[in-house]
Amino acid sequence: MARRTRTRRLVAAVGITALATGAALITVPQPAAVAATAAVTVRPDPSYRQEKFEGWGTSLAWFANVTGGYPEEIRQKLARLLFDDDGLALNIARYNIGGGNAPDVKDYLRAGGAVEGWWRAPEGTTREDTGWWDAKDPADWNPRADATQRWWVDRIKNDIDHWETFSNSPPWFMTRSGYVSGGFDAAQDQLKAASADDFAAYLAGATRRLEKEHGIKVDTLDPFNEPNTTYWSTRLGSDGEPVGGRQEGAHMGPELQQRVIRALAPALRASGTRAKISAMDETNPEVFARNWHSYPAEVRALVDRMNVHTYGTAGRTTVRDLAKAAGKPLWMSEVEGDWGDGQDFADMSPGLGLAQHMVDDLRELEPRAWVFWQPVEDYDNMKPGGESAKGGNWGSIQLPFSCTAEDTLDTCPIRTNTKFDTARNFTHYIKPGDRLIKVDDTSSAAAVAENGRGATVVHVNSTTAERTVTVDLSKFARVSRGATVTPVVTSAGGKLERHPAIGVTGRKATFTVPAESVTSFVVTGVSGVAEDAAVPRKDATYRLTGVHSGKHLTATETGLVVKSAGAPGGTPRWQLRGIGGATGSTRRHVITDPAGGKRLTVRATGNHAPVLEPDRAAPDQLRSA
């Protein structure tokens, strides 16, 4: 959580030319940002559809560590709010494998932050004793560890389609500082290099024990959390005892990350789990990309899925393209935030901020899944005078993390804010198995139903004025006579209010959404892809235009040149031919010069300049929206 190859590659663009490691991507022009207009038309385009969406999720970690021991009525209500169909309807859970400080270290982490590790230290062990643990010795494992977080595993396992385990820090005896809150220098590697194999065995062993004890199947294990940052440090007080940081965390630079991944692959096989490696849960796309670019091919090959956080948002499309080039699924595996100005359960600003962030992640990152950090937060931290004078809006659900076995829902109340409501506009209507599709509006996300007969558009109106939204269905091949669009609106006036279905006329339906609202438009009676929607189309020609220069790529007798629009020499045109059996966002293409019959490629050496060559070698090219 944030504190807060091939020897030849093709390159082309419709609107933007983009190069990516391992493949080149055809990138469709991005729609302009929506201003505070009184009317907007939204066009969902199923010609560009992604792989099946895996769902919505949460990390367990702190809130589960605290509330797993709460009175039954409290924890059951929480579970319903998170996982029931009327709640957030989450179907993905990430279990936190705790590191754990030494037995003689007094707890100094935030409420819930001290997730118990799976090790069992010999009696009398202190922080100075670091060489005793042996992954092969059953006596060094604690099969009853972490009972509170594991209560949640049993409670929700019938609701969960995908399990992931992850680590915030190695156990104290594998760290350089001797504490799980980070090193004394937050920029230095915290895991001892000599402990990489032990760390891998610890994570794999805990994952396999979790599976066996609870009867679940873990899909992936991510050994890192925001590793290449300077967030994680331990501070000692005047008495030499730790006083901060307040959560588990460990800096691991790219080289150490690679060492851990190399060690983890055989450790997983040896443990008996079928879990694969995911990585690296970096804090934002830009840092993720730097880490990933440093990984050699054999390390990348060991990573089954790419995980990124979006606490920073620049570079979303870079990571999207890296995942496509690598042929790997991508998750937005963690984010949270405030998006308000002081704790307020009725203010729409936090809900609108979260909703726009979700739209941007879905549109730009194109993830297979979207996962909350902690939808349940500590009310004591978030109330005015807690972590800040005004308080805050982290989490969609807040309750005190200080409740006791004697408390009830009256004395330990559960509160929800507007983020809980606007999130459900997504989680209720874009479902696992649906496919996210292109949409030409930056305030909207869209998906087609798993069966291909229906769609959903989620639109965010963050302005203080109502807005007329026209849903244009002309990109679908078939729009039935009985097609309808049903708005489901969350605003200050109500939560998920379902309005009467609107009949589709001329392939369009119009509805006026309230100010400061999130609306799910549920579309029935549509299917297929209109012939004029598909890009590229057979026998059509396209310009290749630099996104920064605005100039066109042109083939001449002497090679390739870049010309300004309207320059002498005619209008440069190219043809794009789809190949292979894939469809939608993973379809591969070859780009040819229709006049000369040659294909566009990139030099394998030197300056990697684009060149024309005879159309023969297998292309490696993908389109992105």
Q: PLM ranges: what are they?
A:
Residues 37-219, 223, 262:
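N-terminal catalytic cores of secreted or lumenal carbohydrate-active enzymes
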Residues 52-60, 90-97, 101, 162-166, ...:
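Structural recognition of the beta-strand scaffold that forms the well-ordered cores
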Residues 15, 22, 529-625:
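Lectin-like carbohydrate-binding module/patch detector with strong preference for beta-trefoil
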Residues 330-424, 437-441:
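Aromatic/acidic polysaccharide-binding cleft in carbohydrate-active enzymes
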